[in-house]
Structure formats: structure tokens, C-alpha cells
Amino acid sequence: DVYPVLYMKYRLLGQNSSHNGIKHLVVDEMQDYSRLQYLIIKMMFPCRMTILGDKAQTMEDENQDVIGFLPKIFGKDIRRIVMNKSYRNTIEIASYANQLAGITEVELFERHGKPVEEKEFPGLIEALERVVKELKLEKQAVTEAEADRMKMADMETAGAEGQEEFSYETAAVITRTADEAREAYYILQKKLEAEGFDTKERLSLLHRDSTNFKKGLTVTTFYMAKGLEFDQVFSVFPGADRSPIVQRARYIA
């Protein structure tokens, strides 16, 4: 109830003068804010703004489309800039993600990598057994200098052998719900310990109450993974469910 209370406060008492010194406000992940939150932002910060985001990274329906209601809040003279070139991902990853979201107008930066693979398994345990086999992380924690040295050595070996086999610093198992993430974490904990993996230092469950982020294998949900980057990612979703809302969750992951 905090946002309705804040809205009533600013409507009744006016704007806090401590914000008057702010000349320009930058809002990121614009798709994650509601209409009420934007109304509060407008009252709190009567200054120029730059609002950034990815419209496709939302689980809301068309009635909550930020692009649709922002002009009604900030005025019709707002300037809209659409950035259609993607630099972050490889062509293979970006093409796969855009297909999930039905995006066709994006220009992809010419950078290639391994293609995205989709595999089906009878259940979560079998899927995570495959994750353990394909995971490319050091089993024990190492210093940053040691990690750089090992990566260089692995890359030199891979180059000599014509392969791309080397260890990563970070990896993630991304699920749909918090319960699925918790279940996956405990399954992975047992299976990785059996493989000699230092799970205390190299395995973590990232949730809403987490206070730190460490290297190694992170298990989390698609909505907690937003804004984070990993060297290797395993997205574990129910294969039979291809509904629009689940496809959007896959895109975000």
C-alpha cells in the first residue's frame, strides 16, 4: 500500500523541496514501473527526465503498456527515440530471444557465438543432470588473478587444438518461479558436491532477500536475473507450456 499512500501524501501536502536541486532524472527499466509510480515520480521530480527500457521485458498486458500511458502523464510533447540496434548479445542469442518475443525490427550487431540449444527432459532432475555435465566452471574458488591466468592458459590450449573448451567465471540456472529455483538449488547442491564442487563458495541461490552476488553458479528466477550477466546460462522452463506469458518470461531470461 506504500504507493497509494505516497500518492495521497504528495497530492495533499505537495512536493518535497529537497528534490528541487535535481536537474535531470534518469529512469531505467521503465517497463517495471506502474502508472501510479510514474505519477508519483512526476510529483517528486519536477525536472527533465530520460526514461529507458525494453518494452518486451514486461509480464503485463496491453492495458499496462508504458509507451501508451506515459504521454498522458508527462504530456504529449515528450520525445520518443526507438533504438533498433542490439549490441549486447551475439546474433545467435539475440535472434533466439527476438523470436520468442515476436520482435522483427531489430538490427543485430555482427558478433557470432554458439547457437542456442533447446533440449527436453522427462523432469527437473534429468534436466539438472545435463546442466552438471555441461557446466564449465572451476570446482573450487580461485582468486581473480588465478582465474585470469587459467583462462589465458585454457584459451591458448583451445586455440592450439582448434576447440573452444575453457572454464567460465559465472554461470546461471534460471527458472520460472521462486519455488522452482529453490528446488533446483537443492538438487544441484547434492549433485555438484558428488562431483567435488565447492558448493559453499561456488553455488548460490539468488532471491529477493539476497544481499550479495558472487561468482560461480547462481540459481535464480527470470525476474531476479534481469540486469545480470553470466558467461554460461541454462534456462530451465516447463517445455510443454508455450503460452504468451511464458514466452515473455523466456525472453526476459
Place the predicted regions along the sequence by residue:
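Low-complexity/IDR signal
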Residues: L6-Y7, I93
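Coupling/switch/interface segments within P-loop NTPase motor domains and analogous charged loops
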Residues: D1-V5, L135
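Conserved helicase motor core of SF1/SF2 NTP-dependent helicases
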Residues: L12-H24, Q31-I252
